[in-house]
Amino acid sequence: ATRAGDLTPLQLESLREVCELNVSCDEMADTAGIVAAYIAYYGPIQF
């Protein structure tokens, strides 16, 4: 599984930019973290 520590700051920012367009994903990111939220809404991270 991908963890935040496995990604560069630029990759994390890319995930945030996608996730913040979806209110539900953005809210989940605030509580569960950006990686968990992105995977829940968009599937595996493709970097």
From Swiss-Prot:
According to the lineage, what is the superkingdom?
A: Eukaryota
Keyword annotations for this protein, in alphabetical order, are: Biomineralization, Calcium, Disulfide bond, Gamma-carboxyglutamic acid, Hormone, Metal-binding, Secreted
Q: Which SUPFAM superfamilies match?
A: GLA-domain
- Which positions make up the signal peptide? none
Work out whether the entry's keyword set contains Calcium.
yes
| One of the protein's GO biological processes | bone development
Tell me the residue numbers annotated for binding Ca(2+) 2.
17, 20
Give the intrachain disulfide bonds. 19-25
Q: What does the entry report about post-translational modification of this chain?
A: Gamma-carboxyglutamate residues are formed by vitamin K dependent carboxylation by GGCX. These residues are essential for the binding of calcium.
- Please name the InterPro entries in this protein's record: GLA-like_dom_SF (IPR035972), GLA_domain (IPR000294), Osteocalcin (IPR039176), Osteocalcin/MGP (IPR002384)
Task performed by this protein? The carboxylated form is one of the main organic components of the bone matrix, which constitutes 1-2% of the total bone protein. The carboxylated form binds strongly to apatite and calcium.
Query: Any idea what this protein is called?
Result: Osteocalcin
